Amino acid sequence: MLCVAASTACSNQPQPNSADKTFVAEMVPHHQIGIDMINSAVLRSDDVRLRKLVFQMQSYHEHELHELSSHLQQWKISSAKIFPGLIDPNRLAKIDELTGPAYDIAWLKAMIEHHNGAVAIGKMQMKLGQIPSLIDVAKKVVTTQQAEIIEMQKILAEK
């Protein structure tokens, strides 16, 4: 196997198929929105459980975004404009106008919707993708975000 030192690709690395490219094109803006939502909750939520969850989300979102963005650039593809879990910027602006429990409830509902979109994107990659590292990212997205949905639903049920 020959690998070029400066390249991330090896000669036996499969070429990305349309599912791989779609996964990257959708997950990059998806994670960018997620990070914006997370940053909002860091500043605005007073709920200890929600803040703990948000800090957990923050670290892996940034790591995955960096990894996925490198594929976006390498493959010279654009971010998707529409994708599962896309939250309307006007809705996010209205959420940011809220305070206290009203903010937390609206934020949780939006993030659950957002996570459900990531799970759908991840499952599609697991089914149709062929780049092993991206399939691994998809598995992590599905597993992690399904667990977070359950946690957010618990927090929401107690509001």
State where each predicted segment sits.
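C-terminal motif of bacterial Sec signal peptides marking the signal peptidase cleavage site
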Residues: A6-A9
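Sec-dependent N-terminal signal peptides
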Residues: M1-L2
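All-alpha RGS (Regulator of G-protein Signaling) helical domain and cognate RGS-like helical scaffolds
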Residues: S11-K159
